Amino acid sequence: MTADRNMRRTVVGRVVSDKMDKTIVVLVETYKTHPLYGKRMKFSKKFKAHDENNTAKVGDIVEIMETRPLSKDKRFRLVRIVEEAVIV
């Protein structure tokens, strides 16, 4: 069973919202190369992720992992906080 759990997709992104209880919104940015012109273009996507202890804050860099559907929109869960946000 643990081998299947580790095969799930993990992504790293930045927390853009933590206003919901036990839920964070993570912005994940990826780069793709244009097939004809070869220019690298930036694409971004937002994922809602489950944060059981409400530990992640806005601006944190986090790692999230794919999981079973937890609600209508939540398909990811928080694995760890890679880097905490700098408060100025």
UniProtKB/Swiss-Prot annotation:
Provide this UniProt record's keywords sorted from A to Z.
Ribonucleoprotein, Ribosomal protein, RNA-binding, rRNA-binding
Gene3D superfamilies the UniProt entry points to: Nucleic acid-binding proteins
Q: Name one Pfam family in it.
A: Ribosomal_S17
Q: Which GO terms describe its molecular function?
A: rRNA binding; structural constituent of ribosome
Classify the source by domain of life: Bacteria
GO CC terms: cytosolic small ribosomal subunit
- Protein's GO biological process: translation
Q: Which InterPro entries match?
A: NA-bd_OB-fold, Ribosomal_uS17, Ribosomal_uS17_bact/chlr, Ribosomal_uS17_CS
Matching SUPFAM superfamilies, A to Z? Nucleic acid-binding proteins
Family of this protein: Belongs to the universal ribosomal protein uS17 family.
* HAMAP family in the record: Ribosomal_uS17_B
**Assembly, per entry:** Part of the 30S ribosomal subunit.
What does this chain do? Answer: One of the primary rRNA binding proteins, it binds specifically to the 5'-end of 16S ribosomal RNA.
Q: Report the PANTHER family cross-referenced here.
A: 40S RIBOSOMAL PROTEIN S11 FAMILY MEMBER (PTHR10744), SMALL RIBOSOMAL SUBUNIT PROTEIN US17M (PTHR10744:SF1)
What name appears for this protein in its UniProt entry? Small ribosomal subunit protein uS17
Biological source species: Brevibacillus brevis (strain 47 / JCM 6285 / NBRC 100599)
The gene coding this protein: rpsQ
